[in-house]
């Protein structure tokens, strides 16, 4: 009996010593040598994506990844081919993970950026690289690379690409801006920010989730319905003698931000700059009076005038920029 009990205790101690809890090490806490190893692979990856070098991509990928190489890279390689992205990139976040079960669904919670990343680990050790690459200093794309340790080497098991942020703000941060606009009564500006936040919800396809996702979708759909119902176009500015017609409210993206664009048709020929400018003064007065749900204190407000021919087709346009 004593021998049996002793054997059970020894077995329990052995099993406990062999058991390893799942572990995730983030960013600067990761071993520097390992970070350098992965950095070299990421640099090679970006060079290969930029050049569409399938041989290098196959060398970096695992056997399973290479079986579906074309499908895996389909949504990743197009920003490089279209010139949106180059080899320039920086680490957004990175995680070294140790797992107890293979394969299994693993979850990482970002303490820095507030998202949850869920993926299937195909090895006892994985490394997740979240790499940011910018287009014209406006749009930030996220290239998410999941490496699995195969023997003594690290191989790509998964890769995705998506829009991470605009003007340095991700979905959660843009949503916060939308709520600020809404609280101030600027419903149209809130709507534009909600629409943008919605577009930023999948920087890594379905791998990354923000806790605000349901709220963003709910608030966008609610505001979209309200805008469509209450703020109709076209709208005739009847108090102005020339009767210009507001046709559309959209936005302009420049290097400093997203700003309102008010498009209208006018009976004044665009070549008559004096009359056109005088009419614009009246348009600004009427628009600011009737559209108080737009923030006209923004740095730029754009007005675009159109001429329409006898067949109702747009001939020419001219854009005015109001700088506050």
Identify what each model region corresponds to.
Residues 36-38, 123, 133-140, 169-174:
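Generic helix N-cap/helix-start motif at coil->alpha-helix transitions
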Residues 1-29:
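Bacterial Sec-dependent N-terminal signal peptides
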Residues 133-168, 252-261, 285-322:
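Short beta-strand edge/turn micro-motifs at domain boundaries
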Residues 41-57, 178, 184-188:
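Short helix-adjacent coil turns
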Residues 56-114, 200-227:
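Short solvent-exposed beta->alpha transition segments
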Residues 18-51, 160-172:
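Short, low-complexity N-terminal intrinsically disordered segments enriched in polar/charged residues
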């Amino acid at each position: 009996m004593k021998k049996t009990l002793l054997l059970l205790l020894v077995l329990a101690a052995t099993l406990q010593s062999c058991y390893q809890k799942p572990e995730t090490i983030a960013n600067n806490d990761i071993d520097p040598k390992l970070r350098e190893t992965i950095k070299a692979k990421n640099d090679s990856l970006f060079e290969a994506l930029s050049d569409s070098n399938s041989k290098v991509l196959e060398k970096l990928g695992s056997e399973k990844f290479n079986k579906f190489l074309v499908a895996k890279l389909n949504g990743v390689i197009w920003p490089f081919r279209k010139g949106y992205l180059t080899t320039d990139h920086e680490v957004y976040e990175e995680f070294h993970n140790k797992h107890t079960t293979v394969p299994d669904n693993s979850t990482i919670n970002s303490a820095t950026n507030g998202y949850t990343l869920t993926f299937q680990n195909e090895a006892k050790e994985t490394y997740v690289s979240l790499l940011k690459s910018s287009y014209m200093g406006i749009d930030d794309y996220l290239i998410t690379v999941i490496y699995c340790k195969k023997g003594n080497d690290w191989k790509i098991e998964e890769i995705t690409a998506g829009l991470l942020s605009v003007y340095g703000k991700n979905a959660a941060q843009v949503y916060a801006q939308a709520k600020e606009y809404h609280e101030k009564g600027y419903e149209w500006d809130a709507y534009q920010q909600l629409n943008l936040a919605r577009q930023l919800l999948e920087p890594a396809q379905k791998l990354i989730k923000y806790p605000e996702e349901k709220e963003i979708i709910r608030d966008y759909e609610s505001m979209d319905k309200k805008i469509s119902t209450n703020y109709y176009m076209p709208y005739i500015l009847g108090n102005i003698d020339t009767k210009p017609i507001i046709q559309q409210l959209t936005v302009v993206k420049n290097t400093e931000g997203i700003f309102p664009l008010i498009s209208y048709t006018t009976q004044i020929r665009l070549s008559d700059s004096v009359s056109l400018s005088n009419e614009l003064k009246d348009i600004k007065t009427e628009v600011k009076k009737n559209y108080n749900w737009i923030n006209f204190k923004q740095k730029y407000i754009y007005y675009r005038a159109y001429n329409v021919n006898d067949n109702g087709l747009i001939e020419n346009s001219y854009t005015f920029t109001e700088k506050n």
